[in-house]
Amino acid sequence: FLYKFLNDKFLYEVQQADEKLKDSENVEQALNDMSEEDYEMLLMLLPPATAKLKREHFISYLFNHKNDEKFNALFDSTLWDISNTNLDVFSVSTGSGDKIRLFDQNLSQNVTESNRRSDFCKAMIDKLVTFSFAEAFSQKYDFFATIFEYLIKDYNKDFGKYAEYYTPHSIASIIARI
């Protein structure tokens, strides 16, 4: 979910930053066709609170490689690289100064059966590629509220109509910056 949000937010912001991209039918292809120098210049024009993504971070890139052997390793390394690339903007420091990153280093390791990890990552990418936040970025309302309510609707279902939950400060800080 967060990966998709960052990806779509990035694409929205590059369209705002570059007039040529505003009318592009395929923004990602236009970005892929840019020279490395032009791409780096475009990244400098983005608002500070926008994640900086490399072209290989795009969801479409992962989607096009989902049938590669060990896809889960590509998926994990992509999220980890996004975390490291944007560490100064999207991280929270602990009391001892350690940085808490956006994504865990090996997210797919949470799937117990090692032979199912790539399938899990493929299924996630298949779902993410069909959804878009694009319209939400120009709106001025809290679209997260509905999403969180949906995600946690069954969490505390026996104690009232709406779920009761606690968002840790580190997560709330990251969400607030996004």
Spell out what each predicted region is.
Residues F1-I178:
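Non-catalytic, mostly N-terminal accessory regions of nucleic-acid modification and defense proteins
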